[in-house]
């Protein structure tokens, strides 16, 4: 699933490709992608004539700000956007197409068919939709070691599942939680409330630096992820533990292991991340 760096990269590329374009019509080939409104014809009708004024990321969601509404899109496992000319061949698994007045198209393709789209009147998207209960943005200036410490204080939950909880901190998924915990030297099963002040500071620093580096490198293309221009990310080449089971730790040389925490495959260095 695309995480914060991948979604941020998609947003940045799409801004340069479709901002300012006006929707002439919309084609929906898989109705269940559209959740709000529950009438697909209403969804299509509401979008006609609206111009994309801005595109922003909130957590792992893409927000298309239009004249009257906000389209909130989640890529889920393998959703992707691409911009094409109207006469370009349409790839299999293309489920939604936004046809622009200039003859170009924004196409949404999703092999797994798990992605979602919700259309809300401006101002309502943060109160009644999937954005309503999201936690703090880890790349926002408001995310400080003190804020992280308050989120963890008194929690008996293991640190990894808590970091994956989007109501606490948004945008983190399996890849970047494993990487952040490794850099901070913290075992993923340690109770969140048991982290020392120094560990909280290290964890904060590792979360921010890991995400910033990943954004700079266009995200991680582990499976099918590409940005809005069809380009792969490069951060997978910089991963220190994720996906490196049985390889040597870059810090100490110990063998990286994989096990399950909270139902999620987890990679650690058993020497650098002792459970104590």
UniProtKB/Swiss-Prot annotation:
Q: Keywords assigned by UniProt?
A: DNA damage, DNA repair, DNA-binding, Glycosidase, Hydrolase, Lyase, Metal-binding, Multifunctional enzyme, Zinc, Zinc-finger
Q: Does the keyword Zinc apply?
A: yes
Q: Which InterPro entries match?
A: DNA_glyclase/AP_lyase_DNA-bd, DNA_glyclase_Znf_dom_DNA_BS, Formamido-pyr_DNA_Glyclase, FPG_cat, MutM-like_N-ter, Ribosomal_uS13-like_H2TH, Znf_DNA_glyclase/AP_lyase, Znf_FPG/IleRS
Required cofactor(s):
Zn(2+)
Which reaction(s) does the protein catalyse, per the Swiss-Prot or TrEMBL entry?
Hydrolysis of DNA containing ring-opened 7-methylguanine residues, releasing 2,6-diamino-4-hydroxy-5-(N-methyl)formamidopyrimidine; 2'-deoxyribonucleotide-(2'-deoxyribose 5'-phosphate)-2'-deoxyribonucleotide-DNA = a 3'-end 2'-deoxyribonucleotide-(2,3-dehydro-2,3-deoxyribose 5'-phosphate)-DNA + a 5'-end 5'-phospho-2'-deoxyribonucleoside-DNA + H(+)
One Pfam match, given by its short name, reads Fapy_DNA_glyco
Entry's Gene Ontology molecular function annotations: 8-oxo-7,8-dihydroguanine DNA N-glycosylase activity; class I DNA-(apurinic or apyrimidinic site) endonuclease activity; damaged DNA binding; zinc ion binding
Q: Which residues form the active site?
A: 2-3, 60, 264
Q: Where are the zinc fingers (FPG-type)?
A: 240-274
Which family would the database say this protein is a member of? Answer: Belongs to the FPG family.
Subunit organization: Monomer.
What is known about what this protein does? Involved in base excision repair of DNA damaged by oxidation or by mutagenic agents. Acts as a DNA glycosylase that recognizes and removes damaged bases. Has a preference for oxidized purines, such as 7,8-dihydro-8-oxoguanine (8-oxoG). Has AP (apurinic/apyrimidinic) lyase activity and introduces nicks in the DNA strand. Cleaves the DNA backbone by beta-delta elimination to generate a single-strand break at the site of the removed base with both 3'- and 5'-phosphates.
Q: Tell me the PANTHER family matching this sequence.
A: FORMAMIDOPYRIMIDINE-DNA GLYCOSYLASE
Task: List the protein's name.
Answer: Formamidopyrimidine-DNA glycosylase
Q: Which organism is it from?
A: Brevibacillus brevis (strain 47 / JCM 6285 / NBRC 100599)
The gene is mutM
């Amino acid at each position: 699933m695309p995480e914060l760096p991948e979604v941020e990269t998609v947003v940045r590329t799409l801004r340069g490709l479709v901002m300012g374009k006006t929707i002439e019509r919309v084609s929906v080939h898989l109705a269940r992608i559209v959740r709000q409104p529950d009438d697909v014809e209403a969804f299509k009708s509401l979008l006609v004539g609206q111009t994309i004024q801005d595109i922003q990321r909130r957590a792992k969601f893409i927000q298309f700000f239009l004249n009257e509404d906000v389209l909130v899109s989640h890529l889920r496992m393998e959703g992707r956007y691409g911009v094409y000319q109207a006469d370009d061949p349409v790839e299999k698994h293309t489920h939604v197409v936004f046809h622009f007045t200039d003859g170009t198209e924004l196409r949404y393709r999703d092999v797994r068919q798990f992605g979602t789209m919700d259309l809300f009147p401006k101002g309502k998207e943060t109160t009644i939709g999937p954005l309503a209960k999201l936690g703090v943005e880890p790349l926002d200036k408001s995310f400080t070691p003190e804020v992280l410490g308050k989120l963890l204080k008194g929690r008996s939950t293991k640190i990894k599942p808590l970091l994956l909880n989007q109501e606490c901190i948004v945008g983190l998924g399996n890849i970047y939680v494993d990487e952040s915990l490794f850099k901070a030297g913290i075992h993923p099963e340690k109770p969140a409330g048991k982290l020392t002040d120094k560990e909280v500071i290290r964890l904060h620093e590792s979360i921010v630096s890991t995400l910033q580096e990943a954004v700079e490198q266009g995200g991680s293309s582990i499976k099918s992820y590409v940005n809005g221009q069809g380009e792969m990310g490069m951060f997978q080449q910089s991963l220190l533990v994720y996906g490196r089971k049985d390889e040597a730790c870059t810090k100490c040389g110990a063998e990286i292991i994989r096990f399950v925490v909270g139902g999620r495959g987890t990679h650690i260095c058993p020497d650098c991340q002792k459970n104590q």
